[in-house]
Swiss-Prot record:
This protein's name: Small ribosomal subunit protein uS5
Signal sequence range: none
Protein source organism: Thermotoga neapolitana (strain ATCC 49049 / DSM 4359 / NBRC 107923 / NS-E)
Encoding gene per record: rpsE
GO cellular component: small ribosomal subunit
Upper taxonomic lineage: Bacteria, Thermotogati, Thermotogota, Thermotogae, Thermotogales
PROSITE patterns referenced in this protein's UniProt entry, alphabetically: RIBOSOMAL_S5, S5_DSRBD
Coiled-coil zones: none
Length: 178
């Protein structure tokens, strides 16, 4: 049991953490208002792994701890090629949409605060983004994560189509694959 806990700690040490939002919420009861906090956190290793978590508690530090733990449980793998994403994608979450486009080396990260935090921690250095619709920080972060989940690694696409990676980039079609 202890070895599993040690392995988890080693696995998580490499992650960098960012707090996206701290929101005070209140529940009205007949005894008065019960205040609590909701925290949205992002973790990533700047090398293709990123996760999003939400924590709720009566105190801010406890909510932050819960959010970071939740983010570490929800880590996804992002295909990063030459510092950018392999293809254009639109991530969606409720009324928020995020357009993610690959960019040439030297472009940098063209993104707003929430989307920037997610793509930086994913290890993407060159990307063009545009937030469409609602700009709620939680929904934007989730839309970005959903978009990154939809990305396809060119090597996997080439293997599925039984062609080379170069042919994937050139858009070559084989006879019979109309």
């Amino acid at each position: 049991m202890e070895t599993q806990e040690v392995m988890r700690e080693i696995q998580y040490e490499e992650f960098e953490e960012k707090i996206i939002e701290i929101r005070r919420t209140s529940k009205v009861t007949k005894g008065g208002k019960n205040l609590s906090f909701r925290v949205v956190a992002i973790v990533g290793n700047k090398n293709g792994k990123v996760g999003l978590g939400i924590g709720k508690a009566r105190e801010v530090p406890e909510a932050i701890r819960k959010a970071i733990a939740d983010a570490k449980k929800n880590v996804i793998e992002v295909p990063v090629i030459n510092g950018t994403i392999p293809h254009e994608v639109i991530g969606r979450q409720d009324a928020s949409r995020v357009l993610l486009k690959p960019a040439a080396p030297g472009t940098g990260i063209i993104a707003g605060g929430t989307v920037r935090a997610v793509v930086e921690l994913a290890g993407i250095q060159n990307i063009l983004t545009k937030a469409l619709g609602s700009t709620n920080p939680l929904n934007l972060a989730m839309a970005t994560i959903n978009g990154l989940k939809e990305l396809l690694d060119p090597r996997k696409v080439a293997k599925l189509r039984d062609i080379t990676v170069e042919e994937v980039y050139r858009g070559v079609r084989r006879e019979g694959n109309a």
